[in-house]
Amino acid sequence: MGGLKKPKKKYLAGKPKKIWNKQLLLEELQLMGEYGLRNKKELWLARAHLKWIVRRARSLLSMTAEERAPLELPFKEKLYKMGFIEDPNVPLDRVLSLDVRAILERRLQTIVYRMGLAKSIYHARQLIVHGHIAVAGRRVSSPGFLVPRELEDKISLIQ
């Protein structure tokens, strides 16, 4: 029997190459304050998720029209269901123009705050971590949970 392997870090794709770039540091600090992120790893996870989406869209754009047709609609429908795009019929160029804010807006913490269930973004995080928020009747304790469009109206406060 071999030894256990160390699990691969999921945020490495979103981690910047030069982390001490002043402009990048200021931008990250502003995003962390706006969305109530606890550390940069949460931001890097969102960037990695966005990078996967953009990479997939680019690979679809590089295909011929016949190859792309059966793959494009399911991809855009998935993005629509997750709430990253506003319409499943948008062109793929629009998908390429997504930014990290589109991912951060779909986090449970942000949605709880935007719905008015919490007084601040930090209060929303505390409510979620302490188990006072349910999504479709199930308690969710992860503030980074990406809420699909169909479950957005099923978020409730548990007391």
UniProtKB/Swiss-Prot annotation:
Keywords: Ribonucleoprotein, Ribosomal protein, RNA-binding, rRNA-binding. GO terms for biological process: ribosomal small subunit biogenesis; translation. This is Small ribosomal subunit protein uS4. It comes from the Archaea. HAMAP family: Ribosomal_uS4_A. The keyword rRNA-binding applies. GO terms for molecular function: rRNA binding; structural constituent of ribosome. SUPFAM superfamilies: Alpha-L RNA-binding motif. Residues 106-158 form the S4 RNA-binding domain. InterPro entries: Ribosomal_uS4, Ribosomal_uS4_arc, Ribosomal_uS4_CS, Ribosomal_uS4_euk/arc, Ribosomal_uS4_N, S4_RNA-bd, S4_RNA-bd_sf. SMART domains: Ribosomal_S4, S4. Belongs to the universal ribosomal protein uS4 family. One of its GO terms (cellular component) is small ribosomal subunit. One of the primary rRNA binding proteins, it binds directly to 16S rRNA where it nucleates assembly of the body of the 30S subunit. With S5 and S12 plays an important role in translational accuracy. PANTHER family: 30S 40S RIBOSOMAL PROTEIN, 40S RIBOSOMAL PROTEIN S9. Part of the 30S ribosomal subunit. Contacts protein S5. The interaction surface between S4 and S5 is involved in control of translational fidelity. It holds the Pfam family S4.
